[in-house]
Amino acid sequence: DGELITVQDEWNNTYEEGSLKTSATDWINNIGKLQKTEGYKIKVASACNLEITGRPVQIPLNIEIHEGWNIISFPVNGSMDAMQVVQPLIDAGILYKIQDEKGFSIEEWKMGWKDHIRYFNAGEGYLLQANKSGVLTINSADVKSGFYATERIEPDYFSVCYEGNGLNHMNINIVELNATHFRAGDEIAAFDGDICVGAVKLTESDLMNDVVSIPVSASEPNGENGFTEGNPIEIRGW
């Protein structure tokens, strides 16, 4: 229905309309067939649903992980505790970091591993950075039916520069929140110059944990709607 702009796999291969890069008007597929173990970045003109038909993916499912950045699928009809899924990769020294489409992460802080994703959900893909190659196994015994964690409330005062989920996020991790005298409902934002590239509204849970992670969105290839690598980031509160 004219919503799709581009699809990209973890190797930066694309499926997009030829007119974006050439004089051709047909869609050009440099990805090939979609793979059940792979996730994909999808850019659309506005919010919409993608319906995929076919036979359900059989689990247990083994997903090959290579060193560096991977985009993995979650082709399971249900939800799973995210930390439980990736714990074997942590134990094996494979996992460096994993992010959801909004940039929330599971990563190691000085005080240990912090989980800001909570649950892997049906229909989602995840960006995984690995220290070395390995295999991630998704087991059916761990699947919960249709459970979704409560989403974080969007900020009211600060408005981020991008629409949707953002792109190629960086995480700004703030510790010792209680020493700053912030309260639940207060907002913290990250700025690249005058551009708000990420913001969160603090919750009681953030204050209990004394930490918060702010996903900030990178700029698009045209240099708009996100932070520019190498630029200083300023933190503001309200």
Predicted regions and their residues:
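N-terminal exported-region signature
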Residues: 1-171, 175-187, 192-238
